[in-house]
């Protein structure tokens, strides 16, 4: 009986078995092909083009081509007042606008040496953790549909709708919130907001377990993701990975724990990493598991914030909001833990203008995507879909 084997070295090997001995019959030479994947439609993972260099069905490497969604974010920042930049940050990672706003405001507040009311800090954590869960639901749902599973996608978007309703109730928008302002918030949360958030936490906790089991107990999903796109921890660190990507490689690094900001030092939560029992540490399945387990930790954080939050009596969400931002001369870099990793802002001020001299965003999506060449090496073409989905990129943040 003849068997075909792809060597990945420019040939297809034809063998036959004689008893327990494998006999080589011949090597069939193959030519390198260059295949273009994309640019995909923005409704998928974004306008990304991958140029795949293949040897038969094996990918020798894949190179991402970026820039299709470039909107001159950093140049816009040089001609817009500090508060006016907040809506632009919403449009970077548009699936996690609250988190992006917060990262930028943290940087400006550090430059201004502002001290915020504790109620503002707790509200910021609640809305950002809600947005983190919503973002992970999109990541998990679209990842499932990438691999051919439609039902989990519907479940994820059903539960995400509850979060969007809560965020709309607080901010007035389902996406692109412009809610977290420099020095405070646009508005205080409604009177029954905490009660409805608690109801959502009680509702979603069993749903998160159900969603976890729906995919991790699916044999096809596990076979499509386990052992695929493995990234060793040392290589991930050298690339500058962060967030679920780095934790999926077994590195327990989370800015909320390792370089805490706001009230996170007062909160008790775990940083999930794969143990290697169910997945191969660093593979696509590990990255999925981290996101799935993180949602439960976010629920715990939200509950603690509701219990510890000061009352609203006499509270003004704009009490520390400066009427006109004119930062002192200097520079600052501040980073925050976004759903896709560390989002950092470097801001330079000349001390005279109400606009930053320079505003540079450090995008975790861009850094994570830069490892595509290593992730794709030696993989089959269908496995590229699993690898891209596991990165969970948002091209609005990659291209800016």
Swiss-Prot record:
Enzyme class: translocase
Species: Chlorobium phaeobacteroides (strain DSM 266 / SMG 266 / 2430)
Family affiliation: Belongs to the complex I 49 kDa subunit family.
Gene3D superfamilies, per database record: Cytochrome-c3 Hydrogenase, chain B
GO molecular function ontology, one term from the record: quinone binding
Topology of this chain in the membrane: Peripheral membrane protein
Compartment(s) where it occurs, according to its Swiss-Prot or TrEMBL record: Cell inner membrane
Cell inner membrane keyword on record: yes
Protein name: NADH-quinone oxidoreductase subunit D
One of the record's GO cellular component terms: plasma membrane
Main subcellular location: membrane
Catalytic activity: a quinone + NADH + 5 H(+)(in) = a quinol + NAD(+) + 4 H(+)(out)
Subunit structure: NDH-1 is composed of 14 different subunits. Subunits NuoB, C, D, E, F, and G constitute the peripheral sector of the complex.
EC number of the protein: 7.1.1.-
Function: NDH-1 shuttles electrons from NADH, via FMN and iron-sulfur (Fe-S) centers, to quinones in the respiratory chain. The immediate electron acceptor for the enzyme in this species is believed to be a menaquinone. Couples the redox reaction to proton translocation (for every two electrons transferred, four hydrogen ions are translocated across the cytoplasmic membrane), and thus conserves the redox energy in a proton gradient.
Classification via InterPro entries: NADH_Q_OxRdtase_suD, NDH1_su_D/H, NiFe-Hase_large
Keywords, ordered alphabetically: Cell inner membrane, Cell membrane, Membrane, NAD, Quinone, Translocase, Transport
């Amino acid at each position: 009986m003849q068997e075909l084997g792809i060597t990945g070295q420019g040939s297809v090997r034809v063998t036959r078995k004689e008893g327990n001995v494998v006999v080589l019959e011949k090597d069939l030479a193959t030519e390198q092909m260059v295949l273009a994947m994309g640019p995909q439609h923005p409704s998928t993972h974004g306008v990304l083009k991958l140029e795949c260099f293949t040897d038969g069905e094996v990918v020798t490497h894949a190179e991402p081509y970026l820039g299709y969604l470039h909107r001159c974010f950093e140049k816009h920042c040089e001609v817009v007042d500090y508060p006016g930049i907040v809506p632009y940050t919403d449009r970077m990672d548009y699936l996690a606008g609250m988190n992006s706003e917060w990262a930028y405001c943290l940087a400006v507040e550090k430059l201004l040496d502002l001290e915020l009311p504790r109620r503002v800090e707790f509200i910021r954590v609640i809305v950002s953790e809600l947005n983190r869960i919503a973002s992970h639901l999109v990541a998990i749902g679209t990842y499932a549909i990438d691999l051919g599973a439609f039902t989990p996608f519907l479940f994820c978007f059903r539960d995400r709708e509850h979060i969007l309703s809560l965020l709309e109730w607080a901010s007035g928008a389902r996406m692109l919130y412009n809610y977290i302002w420099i020095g405070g918030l646009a508005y205080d949360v409604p009177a029954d907001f905490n009660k409805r958030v608690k109801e959502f936490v009680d509702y979603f906790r069993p749903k998160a377990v159900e969603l976890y089991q729906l995919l991790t107990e699916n044999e096809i999903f596990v076979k499509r993701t386990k052992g695929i796109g493995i990234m060793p921890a040392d290589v991930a660190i050298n690339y500058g990975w962060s967030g679920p990507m780095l934790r999926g490689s077994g590195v327990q690094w989370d800015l909320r724990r390792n370089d805490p900001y706001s009230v996170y030092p007062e909160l008790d939560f775990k940083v999930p990493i794969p143990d290697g029992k169910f997945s191969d540490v660093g593979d696509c399945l590990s990255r999925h598991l981290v996101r799935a387990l993180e949602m439960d930790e976010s629920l715990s954080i939200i509950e603690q914030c509701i219990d510890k939050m000061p009352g609203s009596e006499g509270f003004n969400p704009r009490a520390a909001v400066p009427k006109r931002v004119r930062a002192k001369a200097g520079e600052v870099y501040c980073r925050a833990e976004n759903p896709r990793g560390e989002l950092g802002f470097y801001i330079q001020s000349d001390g005279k203008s109400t606009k930053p001299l320079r505003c540079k965003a450090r995008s975790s999506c861009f850094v994570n995507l830069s490892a595509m060449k290593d992730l794709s090496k030696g993989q089959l073409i269908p496995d590229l879909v699993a690898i891209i989905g596991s990165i969970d990129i948002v091209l609005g943040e990659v291209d800016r």
